Protein backbone atom coordinates (compact mmCIF):
# COMPACT_ATOMS: atom_id res chain seq x y z
CA UNK A 1 0.00 0.00 0.00
CA UNK A 2 1.36 3.39 -0.97
CA UNK A 3 2.27 5.77 1.82
CA UNK A 4 -0.19 8.62 2.23
CA UNK A 5 0.86 11.86 3.83
CA UNK A 6 -2.03 13.15 5.93
CA UNK A 7 -1.53 16.63 7.26
CA UNK A 8 -2.37 16.86 10.96
CA UNK A 9 -2.21 20.26 12.68
CA UNK A 10 -1.02 19.12 16.10
CA UNK A 11 -1.14 22.62 17.57
CA UNK A 12 -4.92 22.47 17.12
CA UNK A 13 -5.32 19.33 19.23
CA UNK A 14 -6.83 21.23 22.20
CA UNK A 15 -9.58 22.59 19.95
CA UNK A 16 -10.11 19.09 18.54
CA UNK A 17 -10.52 17.67 22.05
CA UNK A 18 -13.21 20.22 22.83
CA UNK A 19 -14.94 19.58 19.52
CA UNK A 20 -14.70 15.82 20.06
CA UNK A 21 -16.22 16.08 23.52
CA UNK A 22 -19.22 17.92 22.09
CA UNK A 23 -19.70 15.42 19.27
CA UNK A 24 -19.29 12.44 21.62
CA UNK A 25 -21.90 13.87 23.98
CA UNK A 26 -24.34 14.38 21.11
CA UNK A 27 -23.86 10.79 19.92
CA UNK A 28 -24.35 9.47 23.46
CA UNK A 29 -27.60 11.41 23.79
CA UNK A 30 -28.86 9.62 20.67
CA UNK A 31 -27.57 6.26 21.94
CA UNK A 32 -29.33 6.79 25.29
CA UNK A 33 -32.55 7.93 23.64
CA UNK A 34 -32.40 11.45 25.05
CA UNK A 35 -32.33 12.70 21.47
CA UNK A 36 -34.77 10.82 19.29
CA UNK A 37 -34.05 9.16 15.94
CA UNK A 38 -37.17 8.81 13.81
CA UNK A 39 -37.90 5.66 11.82
CA UNK A 40 -39.98 5.61 8.65
CA UNK A 41 -42.02 2.89 7.01
CA UNK A 42 -39.88 2.86 3.88
CA UNK A 43 -36.37 1.56 3.10
CA UNK A 44 -33.85 4.36 3.72
CA UNK A 45 -30.22 4.08 2.65
CA UNK A 46 -27.78 6.67 3.99
CA UNK A 47 -24.56 7.37 2.06
CA UNK A 48 -22.01 9.44 3.94
CA UNK A 49 -18.66 9.72 5.64
CA UNK A 50 -17.12 10.81 8.92
CA UNK A 51 -14.60 13.16 7.32
CA UNK A 52 -14.95 16.47 5.52
CA UNK A 53 -13.86 16.48 1.91
CA UNK A 54 -14.63 14.34 -1.08
CA UNK A 55 -14.97 10.59 -0.74
CA UNK A 56 -17.11 10.10 -3.83
CA UNK A 57 -20.59 10.30 -2.31
CA UNK A 58 -22.33 11.46 -5.48
CA UNK A 59 -20.84 8.78 -7.80
CA UNK A 60 -21.75 6.11 -5.25
CA UNK A 61 -25.26 7.52 -4.93
CA UNK A 62 -25.57 7.36 -8.72
CA UNK A 63 -24.36 3.74 -8.61
CA UNK A 64 -27.20 2.90 -6.21
CA UNK A 65 -29.72 4.73 -8.39
CA UNK A 66 -28.67 2.70 -11.43
CA UNK A 67 -28.89 -0.47 -9.38
CA UNK A 68 -32.35 0.20 -7.97
CA UNK A 69 -34.36 2.43 -10.27
CA UNK A 70 -35.42 -0.26 -12.77
CA UNK A 71 -37.16 -2.21 -10.01
CA UNK A 72 -38.13 0.43 -7.44
CA UNK A 73 -39.40 4.00 -7.35
CA UNK A 74 -36.29 5.78 -6.07
CA UNK A 75 -36.07 9.17 -4.37
CA UNK A 76 -32.90 11.04 -3.41
CA UNK A 77 -32.97 13.51 -0.53
CA UNK A 78 -30.14 15.99 0.05
CA UNK A 79 -29.81 19.16 2.07
CA UNK A 80 -28.83 20.98 -1.14
CA UNK A 81 -25.56 22.43 0.07
CA UNK A 82 -24.92 26.04 -1.07
CA UNK A 83 -28.23 26.36 -2.87
CA UNK A 84 -29.85 29.79 -2.96
CA UNK A 85 -33.17 28.56 -1.54
CA UNK A 86 -34.55 27.27 1.76
CA UNK A 87 -36.93 24.54 2.86
CA UNK A 88 -38.29 21.56 0.96
CA UNK A 89 -38.00 21.68 -2.82
CA UNK A 90 -38.88 18.86 -5.18
CA UNK A 91 -36.81 19.10 -8.35
CA UNK A 92 -38.61 19.95 -11.59
CA UNK A 93 -37.59 20.65 -15.17
CA UNK A 94 -37.08 24.30 -14.17
CA UNK A 95 -34.66 23.49 -11.32
CA UNK A 96 -30.98 24.30 -11.56
CA UNK A 97 -27.88 24.18 -9.36
CA UNK A 98 -28.81 27.47 -7.74
CA UNK A 99 -32.25 26.30 -6.62
CA UNK A 100 -31.43 22.76 -5.45
CA UNK A 101 -27.61 22.57 -5.28
CA UNK A 102 -25.04 21.25 -7.72
CA UNK A 103 -25.05 17.57 -6.72
CA UNK A 104 -28.86 17.14 -6.64
CA UNK A 105 -29.09 18.93 -9.99
CA UNK A 106 -26.42 16.64 -11.44
CA UNK A 107 -28.38 13.60 -10.27
CA UNK A 108 -31.69 14.91 -11.59
CA UNK A 109 -30.12 15.73 -14.97
CA UNK A 110 -28.87 12.16 -15.34
CA UNK A 111 -31.91 10.36 -13.89
CA UNK A 112 -35.05 12.17 -14.94
CA UNK A 113 -37.29 9.26 -13.91
CA UNK A 114 -36.58 9.52 -10.16
CA UNK A 115 -37.57 12.04 -7.51
CA UNK A 116 -34.85 14.39 -6.27
CA UNK A 117 -35.61 16.66 -3.34
CA UNK A 118 -33.72 18.95 -0.98
CA UNK A 119 -34.48 19.91 2.60
CA UNK A 120 -32.28 20.96 5.52
CA UNK A 121 -34.68 19.07 7.79
CA UNK A 122 -34.30 15.48 6.60
CA UNK A 123 -37.25 14.20 8.67
CA UNK A 124 -39.53 16.81 7.12
CA UNK A 125 -38.12 16.04 3.68
CA UNK A 126 -38.84 12.33 4.06
CA UNK A 127 -42.38 13.04 5.27
CA UNK A 128 -42.99 15.20 2.19
CA UNK A 129 -41.60 12.54 -0.14
CA UNK A 130 -43.86 9.91 1.39
CA UNK A 131 -46.93 12.02 0.55
CA UNK A 132 -46.14 11.75 -3.17
CA UNK A 133 -48.38 9.45 -5.17
CA UNK A 134 -48.58 8.13 -8.72
CA UNK A 135 -46.29 6.36 -8.09
CA UNK A 136 -45.39 6.33 -4.38
CA UNK A 137 -41.75 6.40 -3.30
CA UNK A 138 -40.41 2.90 -2.55
CA UNK A 139 -36.85 3.64 -1.40
CA UNK A 140 -35.09 6.83 -0.28
CA UNK A 141 -31.37 7.52 -0.66
CA UNK A 142 -30.05 10.05 1.87
CA UNK A 143 -27.04 11.92 0.52
CA UNK A 144 -24.37 12.91 3.06
CA UNK A 145 -26.50 12.22 6.13
CA UNK A 146 -24.29 9.92 8.24
CA UNK A 147 -24.18 12.51 11.06
CA UNK A 148 -27.88 13.37 10.72
CA UNK A 149 -29.02 10.99 13.41
CA UNK A 150 -32.52 12.41 13.71
CA UNK A 151 -33.34 9.99 10.88
CA UNK A 152 -32.86 6.30 11.60
CA UNK A 153 -31.74 4.86 8.29
CA UNK A 154 -32.19 1.15 7.77
CA UNK A 155 -28.87 0.83 5.96
CA UNK A 156 -25.86 3.08 6.57
CA UNK A 157 -23.07 3.11 3.99
CA UNK A 158 -19.86 4.76 5.17
CA UNK A 159 -17.28 5.91 2.61
CA UNK A 160 -13.60 6.44 3.37
CA UNK A 161 -10.95 7.65 0.93
CA UNK A 162 -8.18 5.13 0.15
CA UNK A 163 -5.69 8.00 0.33
CA UNK A 164 -7.03 9.27 3.67
CA UNK A 165 -8.52 6.44 5.72
CA UNK A 166 -10.46 7.54 8.78
CA UNK A 167 -8.19 5.40 10.96
CA UNK A 168 -5.25 7.65 9.96
CA UNK A 169 -7.09 10.91 10.59
CA UNK A 170 -8.04 12.95 13.63
CA UNK A 171 -10.85 15.27 14.63
CA UNK A 172 -11.34 18.74 13.23
CA UNK A 173 -9.78 21.26 13.27
CA UNK A 174 -6.47 19.38 13.70
CA UNK A 175 -7.60 16.83 11.14
CA UNK A 176 -10.64 16.29 8.97
CA UNK A 177 -12.87 13.95 10.97
CA UNK A 178 -16.38 15.21 11.68
CA UNK A 179 -16.69 12.77 14.57
CA UNK A 180 -14.47 10.20 16.33
CA UNK A 181 -13.51 7.17 14.25
CA UNK A 182 -15.74 5.02 16.46
CA UNK A 183 -18.63 6.51 14.52
CA UNK A 184 -17.87 3.87 11.91
CA UNK A 185 -19.66 1.37 14.16
CA UNK A 186 -23.04 2.73 13.01
CA UNK A 187 -22.38 1.58 9.44
CA UNK A 188 -23.50 -1.77 8.09
CA UNK A 189 -21.38 -1.27 4.96
CA UNK A 190 -17.98 0.43 4.67
CA UNK A 191 -16.52 1.24 1.25
CA UNK A 192 -12.90 2.23 0.70
CA UNK A 193 -13.21 4.59 -2.27
CA UNK A 194 -10.84 5.96 -4.91
CA UNK A 195 -8.66 2.85 -4.85
CA UNK A 196 -6.03 2.63 -7.60
CA UNK A 197 -7.09 0.18 -10.34
CA UNK A 198 -3.92 -1.85 -9.74
CA UNK A 199 -4.35 -2.17 -5.98
CA UNK A 200 -2.49 -5.25 -4.75
CA UNK A 201 -4.13 -8.15 -2.85
CA UNK A 202 -1.91 -7.50 0.16
CA UNK A 203 -3.28 -3.95 0.36
CA UNK A 204 -6.80 -5.31 0.79
CA UNK A 205 -5.63 -7.34 3.76
CA UNK A 206 -3.69 -4.46 5.32
CA UNK A 207 -6.63 -2.06 5.07
CA UNK A 208 -9.08 -4.66 6.35
CA UNK A 209 -7.00 -5.16 9.49
CA UNK A 210 -6.44 -1.44 10.03
CA UNK A 211 -10.11 -0.51 9.77
CA UNK A 212 -10.90 -3.11 12.45
CA UNK A 213 -14.57 -3.59 11.57
CA UNK A 214 -17.08 -5.70 13.45
CA UNK A 215 -18.47 -9.00 12.09
CA UNK A 216 -21.82 -7.37 11.27
CA UNK A 217 -20.09 -4.89 8.94
CA UNK A 218 -19.33 -5.63 5.30
CA UNK A 219 -16.23 -4.09 3.70
CA UNK A 220 -15.97 -3.29 -0.01
CA UNK A 221 -13.42 -1.49 -2.17
CA UNK A 222 -14.23 0.74 -5.13
CA UNK A 223 -12.43 2.76 -7.77
CA UNK A 224 -13.43 5.38 -10.31
CA UNK A 225 -13.85 4.59 -13.97
CA UNK A 226 -13.86 7.65 -16.21
CA UNK A 227 -16.18 7.89 -19.17
CA UNK A 228 -15.96 9.85 -22.40
CA UNK A 229 -15.61 13.62 -22.35
CA UNK A 230 -19.03 15.14 -23.01
CA UNK A 231 -19.79 18.62 -24.30
CA UNK A 232 -21.29 20.78 -21.55
CA UNK A 233 -22.93 22.98 -24.19
CA UNK A 234 -23.81 20.45 -26.93
CA UNK A 235 -25.55 23.04 -29.12
CA UNK A 236 -22.26 24.93 -29.42
CA UNK A 237 -19.79 22.04 -29.73
CA UNK A 238 -18.67 20.54 -33.02
CA UNK A 239 -17.83 17.26 -31.25
CA UNK A 240 -20.39 16.05 -28.72
CA UNK A 241 -18.27 13.35 -27.14
CA UNK A 242 -14.60 12.41 -27.07
CA UNK A 243 -12.81 9.37 -25.76
CA UNK A 244 -10.02 10.14 -23.35
CA UNK A 245 -7.75 8.04 -25.53
CA UNK A 246 -8.31 10.55 -28.35
CA UNK A 247 -6.43 13.23 -26.41
CA UNK A 248 -3.07 14.00 -27.96
CA UNK A 249 0.08 14.46 -25.88
CA UNK A 250 0.49 17.96 -27.31
CA UNK A 251 -3.08 18.99 -26.48
CA UNK A 252 -3.39 21.64 -23.79
CA UNK A 253 -6.08 21.36 -21.14
CA UNK A 254 -7.43 23.98 -18.79
CA UNK A 255 -8.79 21.89 -15.92
CA UNK A 256 -11.42 23.68 -13.84
CA UNK A 257 -12.35 22.07 -10.53
CA UNK A 258 -14.49 23.13 -7.61
CA UNK A 259 -14.32 19.84 -5.73
CA UNK A 260 -12.70 18.78 -2.47
CA UNK A 261 -9.97 16.63 -4.03
CA UNK A 262 -9.04 16.98 -7.72
CA UNK A 263 -6.09 14.56 -7.47
CA UNK A 264 -7.82 11.58 -9.09
CA UNK A 265 -9.01 13.51 -12.15
CA UNK A 266 -5.54 15.04 -12.56
CA UNK A 267 -3.93 11.60 -12.47
CA UNK A 268 -6.38 10.34 -15.08
CA UNK A 269 -5.76 13.23 -17.48
CA UNK A 270 -2.00 12.99 -17.05
CA UNK A 271 -2.14 9.53 -18.59
CA UNK A 272 -3.00 11.23 -21.87
CA UNK A 273 -1.29 14.64 -21.70
CA UNK A 274 1.04 16.48 -19.37
CA UNK A 275 -0.08 19.89 -20.62
CA UNK A 276 -2.58 20.57 -17.85
CA UNK A 277 -3.23 24.01 -16.41
CA UNK A 278 -5.19 23.56 -13.17
CA UNK A 279 -7.59 26.26 -12.03
CA UNK A 280 -8.83 24.97 -8.67
CA UNK A 281 -11.60 26.44 -6.56
CA UNK A 282 -13.06 25.33 -3.24
CA UNK A 283 -15.66 22.57 -3.07
CA UNK A 284 -19.13 23.64 -4.32
CA UNK A 285 -17.66 27.01 -5.34
CA UNK A 286 -20.17 29.40 -6.89
CA UNK A 287 -18.41 30.94 -9.88
CA UNK A 288 -18.37 34.74 -9.91
CA UNK A 289 -17.95 37.07 -12.88
CA UNK A 290 -14.34 37.49 -11.79
CA UNK A 291 -13.87 33.71 -11.89
CA UNK A 292 -15.36 33.53 -15.38
CA UNK A 293 -13.01 36.29 -16.53
CA UNK A 294 -10.08 34.35 -15.07
CA UNK A 295 -11.17 31.23 -16.95
CA UNK A 296 -11.31 33.20 -20.21
CA UNK A 297 -7.89 34.73 -19.55
CA UNK A 298 -6.21 31.42 -18.70
CA UNK A 299 -7.76 29.65 -21.68
CA UNK A 300 -6.66 32.48 -23.97
CA UNK A 301 -3.04 31.81 -23.03
CA UNK A 302 -3.19 28.23 -24.32
CA UNK A 303 -2.03 27.45 -27.82
CA UNK A 304 -4.87 27.79 -30.34
CA UNK A 305 -5.96 24.73 -32.29
CA UNK A 306 -5.09 22.15 -29.64
CA UNK A 307 -6.76 23.29 -26.46
CA UNK A 308 -9.67 22.18 -24.35
CA UNK A 309 -11.46 23.06 -21.12
CA UNK A 310 -12.22 20.05 -18.91
CA UNK A 311 -14.29 20.14 -15.76
CA UNK A 312 -16.21 17.76 -13.51
CA UNK A 313 -19.88 16.99 -13.92
CA UNK A 314 -20.57 18.76 -10.63
CA UNK A 315 -18.75 21.92 -11.71
CA UNK A 316 -20.49 21.82 -15.08
CA UNK A 317 -23.87 22.17 -13.35
CA UNK A 318 -22.74 25.50 -11.90
CA UNK A 319 -21.18 26.78 -15.12
CA UNK A 320 -24.39 26.10 -17.04
CA UNK A 321 -26.25 28.53 -14.75
CA UNK A 322 -24.11 31.50 -15.78
CA UNK A 323 -25.44 33.71 -18.54
CA UNK A 324 -22.22 35.73 -18.15
CA UNK A 325 -20.06 32.85 -19.42
CA UNK A 326 -18.30 33.92 -22.62
CA UNK A 327 -19.99 32.39 -25.67
CA UNK A 328 -16.61 31.81 -27.27
CA UNK A 329 -15.63 29.39 -24.49
CA UNK A 330 -18.71 27.17 -24.66
CA UNK A 331 -17.64 25.00 -27.66
CA UNK A 332 -14.46 24.02 -25.79
CA UNK A 333 -15.95 22.99 -22.42
CA UNK A 334 -16.26 19.27 -21.69
CA UNK A 335 -17.24 17.39 -18.54
CA UNK A 336 -15.54 14.17 -17.48
CA UNK A 337 -18.08 11.68 -16.08
CA UNK A 338 -17.21 9.28 -13.27
CA UNK A 339 -18.62 5.82 -12.63
CA UNK A 340 -17.98 3.59 -9.64
CA UNK A 341 -16.57 0.09 -9.97
CA UNK A 342 -16.72 -2.36 -7.05
CA UNK A 343 -13.42 -4.25 -6.86
CA UNK A 344 -12.33 -7.75 -5.76
CA UNK A 345 -15.09 -9.39 -7.83
CA UNK A 346 -17.50 -8.28 -5.10
CA UNK A 347 -19.92 -6.32 -7.28
CA UNK A 348 -22.59 -9.05 -7.32
CA UNK A 349 -22.37 -9.48 -3.55
CA UNK A 350 -22.65 -5.73 -3.02
CA UNK A 351 -25.60 -5.44 -5.40
CA UNK A 352 -27.45 -8.30 -3.73
CA UNK A 353 -26.81 -6.77 -0.31
CA UNK A 354 -28.46 -3.52 -1.39
CA UNK A 355 -31.35 -5.06 -3.34
CA UNK A 356 -31.97 -7.60 -0.59
CA UNK A 357 -32.28 -4.86 2.02
CA UNK A 358 -34.81 -2.92 -0.06
CA UNK A 359 -36.91 -5.98 -0.88
CA UNK A 360 -37.00 -7.11 2.75
CA UNK A 361 -37.90 -3.70 4.16
CA UNK A 362 -40.74 -2.46 2.03
CA UNK A 363 -44.07 -1.44 3.50
CA UNK A 364 -45.66 -4.79 2.65
CA UNK A 365 -42.56 -6.89 3.15
CA UNK A 366 -42.36 -7.36 -0.61
CA UNK A 367 -43.00 -5.37 -3.73
CA UNK A 368 -44.54 -6.56 -6.96
CA UNK A 369 -42.04 -6.49 -9.78
CA UNK A 370 -42.51 -3.51 -12.05
CA UNK A 371 -43.39 -4.34 -15.63
CA UNK A 372 -40.47 -2.28 -16.89
CA UNK A 373 -37.96 -3.89 -14.51
CA UNK A 374 -34.83 -5.24 -16.14
CA UNK A 375 -34.09 -8.87 -15.48
CA UNK A 376 -30.82 -9.56 -13.74
From Swiss-Prot:
| Catalytic reaction annotation | a lipid A disaccharide + ATP = a lipid IVA + ADP + H(+)
Secreted keyword on record: no
Specify one Pfam family. Answer: LpxK
The pathway noted for it is: Glycolipid biosynthesis; lipid IV(A) biosynthesis; lipid IV(A) from (3R)-3-hydroxytetradecanoyl-[acyl-carrier-protein] and UDP-N-acetyl-alpha-D-glucosamine: step 6/6
BP terms from Gene Ontology: lipid A biosynthetic process; lipopolysaccharide core region biosynthetic process
Which GO terms label this protein's molecular function in UniProt? Answer: ATP binding; tetraacyldisaccharide 4'-kinase activity
A GO-annotated cellular component: plasma membrane
Q: Which domain of life is it from?
A: Bacteria
* Keywords for the protein's UniProt record, in alphabetical order: ATP-binding, Kinase, Lipid A biosynthesis, Lipid biosynthesis, Lipid metabolism, Nucleotide-binding, Transferase
This entry's Enzyme Commission designation comes to 2.7.1.130
- Say yes or no: keyword ATP-binding present: yes
The entry marks the following residues as binding ATP, namely 51-58
InterPro entries the UniProt entry points to: LpxK, P-loop_NTPase
Q: Which HAMAP family match?
A: LpxK
Q: Which family does it belong to?
A: Belongs to the LpxK family.
Tell me, in a sentence or two, what this protein's role is. Answer: Transfers the gamma-phosphate of ATP to the 4'-position of a tetraacyldisaccharide 1-phosphate intermediate (termed DS-1-P) to form tetraacyldisaccharide 1,4'-bis-phosphate (lipid IVA).
| Protein name as catalogued | Tetraacyldisaccharide 4'-kinase
Q: Which organism is it from?
A: Bacteroides fragilis (strain ATCC 25285 / DSM 2151 / CCUG 4856 / JCM 11019 / LMG 10263 / NCTC 9343 / Onslow / VPI 2553 / EN-2)
Gene that encodes the chain: lpxK
Amino acid sequence: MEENSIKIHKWLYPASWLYGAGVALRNKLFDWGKLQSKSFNVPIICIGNIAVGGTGKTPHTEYLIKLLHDEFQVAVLSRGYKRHTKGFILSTAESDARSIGDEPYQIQSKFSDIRVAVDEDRCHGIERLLTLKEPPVEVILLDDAFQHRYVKAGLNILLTDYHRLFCDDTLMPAGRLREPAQGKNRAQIVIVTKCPPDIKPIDYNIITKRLNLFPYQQLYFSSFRYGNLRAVFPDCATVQERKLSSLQTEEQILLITGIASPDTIIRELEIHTRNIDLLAFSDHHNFSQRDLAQIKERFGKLRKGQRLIVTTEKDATRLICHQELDEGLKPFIYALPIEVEILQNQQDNFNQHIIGYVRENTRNGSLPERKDAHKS
